[in-house]
């Protein structure tokens, strides 16, 4: 049989992306998360498809349809929990992937980075809408609180919120459209992922040193295919440990109570992966200010290439920047913790300090540290 790997139009695309792709010889396990995100996306689309076969997007039956999936559908419980915890694994990989990009200066690949930020926004939107679908207490009140934030937009805010709701409150129309969007967005994410990869392969991968690796490349297969398979096995192992031993570890008990518009839960909070942004939102007493800070906390990633003042791409040889990077990681963990706490002393002030620190680190301290390191190079 003739080997069509390099001649057939379709095979050629796959070959140039995953087989004969020249890759740097020194990329570490931090470069595994891209492929893991791809696996997470495929897993979410497949489990989501099977859930959609049994789910009903109606306020009267949504909650009981999820219960029906868990109790009556063959292996419905495992599909449901793989989907719910798969989202958590997705975001763990996302945060690691973005963190890798920040640490090693991958944001200098502008198109790849900007599409990555759009992908992050799209994934967050998808996850938020997915959380509304089981129609539990936290689903309903989470949807109410987060969509209500848009009312802070001057002049058009109130009309915009009612337009999104499809009425005067979160109701049947809201649930139906959220289900429709939650179904279509992963396919848009998949398409954007292809564009993300397309732009990445225009420049080639970065590497830990941040120095051009053109002189030292190895083929993607078998070196990185086997490495990606190992990463995938570890991902699936972690996911299945979570699903089979403590499926509700990352969920909220309130979501096992059917949605009730007349009874507000004592602490409304989103899923754990949104808590850092939620803490930033809550730390500003003004509604519009809070919403702006919330959006900017993610949108600030777009500014990273402009804030890069160092003569070196990577942080590998920049100890001051390294310290600040890990302070930023600690700050984000603090914000995540604060986001899950009630609004009372001392959590309020800790949240405000952590929020100020977050923006201060990215906008001021890290660019200043880079400039200092540039001057130290002259010595």
From Swiss-Prot:
Gene3D superfamilies: Cytochrome Bc1 Complex, Chain C. GO terms for molecular function: metal ion binding; ubiquinol-cytochrome-c reductase activity. Binds 2 heme b groups non-covalently. Keywords: Electron transport, Heme, Iron, Membrane, Metal-binding, Mitochondrion, Mitochondrion inner membrane, Respiratory chain, Transmembrane, Transmembrane helix, Transport, Ubiquinone. It comes from the Eukaryota. One of its GO terms (cellular component) is respiratory chain complex III. It is a multi-pass membrane protein. Heme b b562 binds at residues 83, 182. The chain crosses the membrane at residues 33-53, 77-98, 113-133, 178-198, 226-246, 288-308, 320-340, 347-367. It is found in: Mitochondrion inner membrane. InterPro entries: Cyt_b/b6_C, Cyt_b/b6_C_sf, Cyt_b/b6_N, Cytb/b6-like_sf, Cytochrome_b, Cytochrome_b_C_euk/bac, Cytochrome_b_N_euk/bac, Di-haem_cyt_TM. Its cofactor is heme b. GO terms for biological process: mitochondrial electron transport, ubiquinol to cytochrome c. SUPFAM superfamilies: a domain/subunit of cytochrome bc1 complex (Ubiquinol-cytochrome c reductase) (SSF81648), Transmembrane di-heme cytochromes (SSF81342). Pfam families: Cytochrom_B_C, Cytochrome_B. The cytochrome bc1 complex contains 11 subunits: 3 respiratory subunits (MT-CYB, CYC1 and UQCRFS1), 2 core proteins (UQCRC1 and UQCRC2) and 6 low-molecular weight proteins (UQCRH/QCR6, UQCRB/QCR7, UQCRQ/QCR8, UQCR10/QCR9, UQCR11/QCR10 and a cleavage product of UQCRFS1). This cytochrome bc1 complex then forms a dimer. PANTHER family: CYTOCHROME B. Belongs to the cytochrome b family. Component of the ubiquinol-cytochrome c reductase complex (complex III or cytochrome b-c1 complex) that is part of the mitochondrial respiratory chain. The b-c1 complex mediates electron transfer from ubiquinol to cytochrome c. Contributes to the generation of a proton gradient across the mitochondrial membrane that is then used for ATP synthesis. Heme 1 (or BL or b562) is low-potential and absorbs at about 562 nm, and heme 2 (or BH or b566) is high-potential and absorbs at about 566 nm. This is Cytochrome b. It comes from Antilope cervicapra.
């Amino acid at each position: 049989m003739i080997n069509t790997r390099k001649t057939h139009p379709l095979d050629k695309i796959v070959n140039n992306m995953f087989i004969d792709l020249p890759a740097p010889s020194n990329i570490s396990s931090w470069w595994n998360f891209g492929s893991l995100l791809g696996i997470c996306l495929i897993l979410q689309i497949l489990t989501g498809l099977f859930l959609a076969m049994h789910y009903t997007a109606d306020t009267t039956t949504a909650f009981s349809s999820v219960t029906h999936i868990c109790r009556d559908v063959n292996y419905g419980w495992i599909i449901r929990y793989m989907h719910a915890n798969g989202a958590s694994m997705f975001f763990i990989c996302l945060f690691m992937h973005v963190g890798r990009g920040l640490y090693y200066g991958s944001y200098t690949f502008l198109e790849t980075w900007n599409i990555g930020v759009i992908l992050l926004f799209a994934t967050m939107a998808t996850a938020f809408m997915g959380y509304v679908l089981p129609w539990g207490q936290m689903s309903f009140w989470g949807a109410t609180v987060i969509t209500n934030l848009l009312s802070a937009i001057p002049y058009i805010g109130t009309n915009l919120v009612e337009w999104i709701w499809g009425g005067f409150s979160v109701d049947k129309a809201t649930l139906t459209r959220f289900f429709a969007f939650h179904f279509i967005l992963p396919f848009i994410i998949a398409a954007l992922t292809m564009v993300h990869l397309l732009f990445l392969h225009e420049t080639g991968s970065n590497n830990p040193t941040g120095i051009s690796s053109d002189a030292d490349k190895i083929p993607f297969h078998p070196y990185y295919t086997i490495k990606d398979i190992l990463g995938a096995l570890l991902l699936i192992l972690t996911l299945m440990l979570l699903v089979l031993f403590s499926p509700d570890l990352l969920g909220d008990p309130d979501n096992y109570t059917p949605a009730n518009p007349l009874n507000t839960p004592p602490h409304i909070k989103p899923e754990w992966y949104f808590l850092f942004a939620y803490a930033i939102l809550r730390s500003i007493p003004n509604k519009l200010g809070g919403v702006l800070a919330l959006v900017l906390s993610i949108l600030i990633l777009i500014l990273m290439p402009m804030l890069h003042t160092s003569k070196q791409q990577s942080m590998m040889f920049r100890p001051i920047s390294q310290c600040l990077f890990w302070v930023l990681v600690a700050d984000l963990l603090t914000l995540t913790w604060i986001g899950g706490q009630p609004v009372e002393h001392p959590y309020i002030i800790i949240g405000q300090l952590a929020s100020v620190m977050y923006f201060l680190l990215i906008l001021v301290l890290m660019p200043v540290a880079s400039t200092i390191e540039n001057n130290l190079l002259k010595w």
